[in-house]
Amino acid sequence: MTWLLLCLLAQYENGGKVLALSSSAKPYKTSVRFDPKTAHPNLVVSQDKKTVTWVQEAQSVPDNPERFNSTPCLLGSPGFTSGKHYWEVEYGNQRELAAGVARKSVKRKDHLRLT
């Protein structure tokens, strides 16, 4: 199983909206919701799970096995095993952003090397 992986690689200076996923008319559109159980403590997931915001002060969240705790990343769902998928990512003043795919076994407790 593979999931959409989003990582915020630099601080967002004034808070506010960092990422938002939207559906597209593309034939391979995939509706994605961010998984708050995987979100790094400095990432806040909106109630509708479509927006992520960087916050300066880390949230007090359980350090569950699914949570990224070193690299500011989170996973989107649902996962997939094959096929073509398309996402649109909107972001604000974030200087660095990485979007990709990750396996279930992605390292979450150590620094994540993005390739």
Curated annotation (Swiss-Prot):
What's the stated role of this polypeptide?
Answer: Neurotoxin that produces dose-dependent hypolocomotion and hyperalgesia in mice. May directly act on the central nervous system, as it is 6500-fold more potent when administered intracerebroventricularly than intraperitoneal.
The record's Pfam families line, in alphabetical order, gives: PRY
What is the protein named? Answer: Vespryn
* Similarity field: Belongs to the ohanin/vespryn family.
**Which cysteine pairs make disulfide bonds?**
none
Signal sequence: where? 1-15
Under the heading SUPFAM superfamilies, the entry gives: Concanavalin A-like lectins/glucanases
